[in-house]
């Protein structure tokens, strides 16, 4: 038969060789004999910074987050396991569908290995789901909803900087203990705002406080007058802002305009307040506000040294999210080196097994729910007279130890957590 085929088609012998070669190659792929060739073809470790680059959360994330990630890559040496390290970035415009589409495109076509920052909670949850599907890593530094390390946890995701439990546990707890018992919430109407209001309400239940009312506003609201006047008429001693970024800035501007606190009977509580918010508003407007933060540039010699380097590039001091972008990226690269691969599973195992000690955290560690636990700090915004230099905005009031700052594993709803029966 072979001889007959050769007579009919003079190239038949050559065709049989091609067929045999393809058969061997297919078998090799089926039994995993070629992964080294596939791995060698991907000659880079790629990090994508997907965040808000132009909207209400861009000051605390944005281009500063991209800069922080690039600083970590440079400090690591620009290569890992002989591969160059590349950083790409994009603006998801705080929209979940755009975040999903971009992350899928990055994982499938750009060969991105890890996505950093993720932006607010709605986009973070969307990216985390795609990372799980593609078996890639997602590190949230810009989002706060505790859902990320609760029911939304995955084997591939890390919640690195703060969450609504830690923020409420610090600020709401401190204000309530100072006598602020009756609260009215002005809340961003999406998963982050809802989570922050709930966690703060849970704190009040343990301190003898109570909620007398709440209003919800759309993200990127321009007019807070109606919400503030309603809160004022409620008689609540504390008007709590369960929002962030530009929404917090606009709400505080309006509260100052309407002189909400002039009577001395009501106070404003900004449950999430960033260094950049204070810079935008000025100390006259923000002085005296309590806040909970994961990082402050002027806390130690190490934070000052790193922050100066950041300032030299960005002409502004870093937020805790941006400092977390640097720390988490460096920890990720060190874990690739230690694991000997950039595959998600082994790298995540190393990240969880290795303590984090740098300018951001001391003895930080990543739990099985993906929550990185570390000390948090209760701070207060300085008065104009107390501030001596540019960006000298916070005075540290107390350290909140990691074990107290974050939700205990015993209360976790993460399916990855093994609880004692």
Regions found by a protein language model. Give the residues of each.
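Extracytosolic ligand-binding ectodomains
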Residues: 3-5, 16-18, 36, 40-421
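RTX-like calcium-binding, glycine/aspartate-rich low-complexity repeat tracts
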Residues: 8
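Twin-arginine (Tat) signal peptide motif
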Residues: 11-22
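Bacterial N-terminal signal peptides
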Residues: 23-33
């Amino acid at each position: 038969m072979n001889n007959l085929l050769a007579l009919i088609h003079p190239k038949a012998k050559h065709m049989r060789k091609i067929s045999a070669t393809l058969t061997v190659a297919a078998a090799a792929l089926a039994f995993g004999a070629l992964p080294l060739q596939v791995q060698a073809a991907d000659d880079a470790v790629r990090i994508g910074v997907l965040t808000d680059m132009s909207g209400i959360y861009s000051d605390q994330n944005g281009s500063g987050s991209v800069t922080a990630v690039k600083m970590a890559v440079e400090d690591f040496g620009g290569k890992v396991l002989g591969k160059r390290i590349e950083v790409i970035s994009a603006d998801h415009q705080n929209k979940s569908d755009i975040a999903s589409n971009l992350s899928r495109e990055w994982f499938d076509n750009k060969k991105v290995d890890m996505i950093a920052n993720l932006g607010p909670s709605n986009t973070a949850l969307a990216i985390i789901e795609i990372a799980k599907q593609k078996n890639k890593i997602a590190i949230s530094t810009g989002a706060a909803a505790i859902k990320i390390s609760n029911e939304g946890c995955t084997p591939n995701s890390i919640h690195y900087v703060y969450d609504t439990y830690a923020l409420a546990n610090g600020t709401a707890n401190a204000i309530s203990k100072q006598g602020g018992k009756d609260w009215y919430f002005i809340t961003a109407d999406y998963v982050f705002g809802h989570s922050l209001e709930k966690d703060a309400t849970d704190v009040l239940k343990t301190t003898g406080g109570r909620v007398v009312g709440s209003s919800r506003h759309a993200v990127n609201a321009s007019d807070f007058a109606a919400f503030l006047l309603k809160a004022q008429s409620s008689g609540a001693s504390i008007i709590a802002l369960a929002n962030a970024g530009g929404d917090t800035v606009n709400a505080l501007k309006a509260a100052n305009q309407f002189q909400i606190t002039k009577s001395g009977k009501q106070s404003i509580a900004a449950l999430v307040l960033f260094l950049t918010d204070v810079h935008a508003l000025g100390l006259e407007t923000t002085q005296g506000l309590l806040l909970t933060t994961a990082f402050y540039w002027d806390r130690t010699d190490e934070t000052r040294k790193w922050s100066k380097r950041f300032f030299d590039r960005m002409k502004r001091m870093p937020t805790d999210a941006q400092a977390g972008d640097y720390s988490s990226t460096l920890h990720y690269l060190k874990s690739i080196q230690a694991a000997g691969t950039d595959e998600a599973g082994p790298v995540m195992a190393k990240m969880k097994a290795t303590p984090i000690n740098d300018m951001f955290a001391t003895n930080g560690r990543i739990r099985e729910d993906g929550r990185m636990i570390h000390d948090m700090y209760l701070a207060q915004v300085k008065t104009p007279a107390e501030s001596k230099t540019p960006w000298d905005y916070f005075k540290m009031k107390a350290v909140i130890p990691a074990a107290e700052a974050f939700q205990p594993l015993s209360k976790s709803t993460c399916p990855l957590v093994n609880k004692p029966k």
